Amino acid sequence: MTKLKDFSKTLTFWLVLINIAVYIAVLINPTLICYLWSYNLLYNSSIEIWRFVTPVFTHAQLYHLVANLLSLVYLGSLVERYLTKTEFLCVYLGTGIISEIATFIAYSWFSPNAVGLGASGAIYGLMGFFITTVVDKKDRFKILIVVIISAVGINLFIPNIGNIAHFAGLFSGLVFGHIFMKYCKHEKANKFLEEYMIEVKNKF
């Protein structure tokens, strides 16, 4: 009960609620999704700016929502432990928006009938940020390769996966993490990183 109470105070908790609320709203009014997803320049010549943000909170299928929320709870809770709320929100929304912009541009050229939606880009952004800020330097490349192979491998089992969003989110997360470690690292982060390394060493 205490853990749930603590979790309810986090931004991750509120991001989960927003995703669920949007999914329920789309179930009630299916036409709403047409105003939330991103789509290419051929159909979106006016470039509706909100479509770079709303897809990050929009899911069409229940399995897509559940998979993303489980990942968000795990990664979000971990990354949020060593960032301020503002920093965490900047990483999550920043990488999510970058992934949607990349999807928007790519679909305009290569998949004119495709649409983009889902929190995956932002979640991969958190993953990239975590790899850069927490994982030991000598292990980063190996873990990055595993993540990339896994992302591509998912295509074999689940159709219509937005790999453009995944990779754009992942690599923007790596960049955000590098910037954080070089210019923004603070006492809260230092304390967490020290404690986390001790936890990892004790497990092995």
Show which residues each predicted segment covers.
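A detector for small-residue-rich transmembrane helices and their helix-helix packing motifs
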Residues: 1-204
